[in-house]
C-alpha cells in the first residue's frame, strides 16, 4: 500500500515494513537588479506579499526554460536571459501542495526590463532591498528575498 502524506510517500510492503520516501518539488526564484540596485518583486494574484518572481519547475523543463516561463507568467517578461545559480534553500513543506520543496536561487540578467504584470502577477515593481524587511507578511517570502540578496552580495559584491 502506498499513500502520499505530508509531502512524502508512505509505503508498506507485504510483510508490514513501512518506508518513507520524500518527494521534492523544485522551485526557482529569479534575483533581478535594475541599474539603481533595486530588486524586481512581484505580488501574485490572490497573494498579499511581495516575492521574487519564480515558481515550480514543470516536468521536462530545464532551469532556463523554467525561468523564462515563470518570468513570463508573473512579470510578463519576453526575451532572452542569462542566469547563474548561486544558492538553495533548505527543505520547506508546502501544505497547499502536500510537497516538500527546495528552492534554487538564480541571479538573472534579462536582455530588457520590460516588466508588466503577467497572467499570474497582480503588481510588479523594483524595490530597495531593505524595503523587503519592512513588509508585513504571513509568510517569510519578503525576508527570504532579502536574505537571497545578501547572499549574492556576500558572494559577488555586485
Regions found by a protein language model. Give the residues of each.
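A short coil-to-beta-strand element that immediately follows conserved catalytic motifs
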Residues: 78-87
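Conserved hydrophobic "DFG−1" position in protein kinase catalytic cores
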Residues: 32-33, 41, 106, 126
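Acidic, metal-coordinating catalytic segment for phosphate/diphosphate chemistry
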Residues: 1-29
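Short helix-loop capping/hinge motifs at secondary-structure junctions, enriched
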Residues: 38-39, 111-115
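Conserved Nudix-box catalytic region and its N-terminal flanking loop in Nudix hydrolases
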Residues: 34-74
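Nudix hydrolase/Nudix homology domain
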Residues: 48-49, 119-158
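Active-site-adjacent beta-strand/loop module that shapes the phosphate/pyrophosphate-binding cleft
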Residues: 90-113, 125
